[in-house]
Amino acid sequence: MQSVTPPPTQQGKPDPTNSDMMMKRFQEDMVGILDGRSRAHFDDLANYFHSKIRICTCFEPGRSLSVPEFQHVLTFISGYYQHLTEVRSDRWTDHPNYINGIFTYTAMGSDRKNSDGKWTYEASMDWNQNKFLIEYIWFPYNCSVFPVKDPSEPLEDVDNYLERVRTKLSSGLFLPDGVDQTLQNFEEFGDWITDDAIIVVCDEQKMDKNEFIKYMSTRYHHIRKYSNNQFDHVKNNQDFEITFSTTWTADNTTQFRDTYIFRVKKAEDYFPENDRLYLLWKIYWVTKRCTVDVTQYPAVLDGSVILGEVNKRFCGMIDGENWDVYQSFLDLFDPNDTKWGSCVGKREQKYDKIREYMNKVVARYAKCVVSEVRIRNLVHADFSTTFLLSRANEIQEQEELDVGFVGYKNKNGHWKINRMYFECEESKKRKFMDNLLNVRLKC
């Protein structure tokens, strides 16, 4: 499978207004569809379908397919094709305003066998729309080359599929120089995700597949620079797990690191044109880890990054706005060297007890607002916060809760919190602050 370039329209190429342009457009889009499984190329080609286009294939001879049916046929064929070679275009007529064209290639199938493919089409100039429109498409191929039995394995080789995902992420959506992404770009990626996929995005509410696609489109629409793309995969029983990370630069030059986990499995797809069920590789689980700020700040400002995240995620648990609230808060702590206390004077607890205690805090309160932040040392992220909390009762009486935090920067340059203390009584505040001062900072 070759790397797929954006469709001609996205490249700024004009509508075809003569037979040469139409022949080139048909080939470019068909290669993108069959060799790259690109929905964007299909949508581009469909812009030049006549309203009364006739589409005939060897799967259902004698019946014209609708445009959605045609797209499904192409999806099926591209699932079987692994790679196209010897691509050629020609025509049987030589007229600037009309073309009777032929598009041929050699394809290697998922069974590693080579076979020839041929498409013919007719198109003519529409002077009202000032572009060529395709009136007829015919796939007169011998359909017996395609699998006719329900396979026990997907049509597409898994290595080919994983490479396709890598190419789509690294060279399609998150290009080093950036690209003006549209919803359509991410909708195409959504075609590779099951409709009932589980989507977990840190700091966001639970969302379905369509909401996730819109989320990605909105988040990355105006990003102009990506760097350090990393793609890895491991086999997990019969499934595969993909980890993809990218660093993106915001308009204010702040740099963030996003990491996604995609779990892939074999999923059934019904192909009505020959009444068969086939298996495809599909993403059925998506996890987006909490975004990491990787900007190189001056030392005096460095700790403000973790300060803001701690306070936001602490309140996020109580406000209940985050689908993965607890994990996003726990991710800020060092699992191996965290000590914390629910009250000064009580026995210090370790990392594995944070979740249990925060469950009690969340059950007690319904709303959280940061009232005051007292900074002792931003270089070491040493600060305490007063949270104004509303009780989870009908009266919603308010209480203040003081919590102190201390952190450090690990060898990878990431901030981690390793000290946290809850102040329970006003009379202990001085002792509370003294304890924070005496905490041994990890540098």
Swiss-Prot record:
InterPro entries: DUF5382_C (IPR048314), DUF5382_central (IPR035415), DUF5382_N (IPR048313). Residues 1-21 are annotated as: Disordered. Residues 10-20 have a biased composition (Polar residues). It comes from the Eukaryota. It holds the Pfam family DUF5382_N. This is Uncharacterized protein B0228.9.
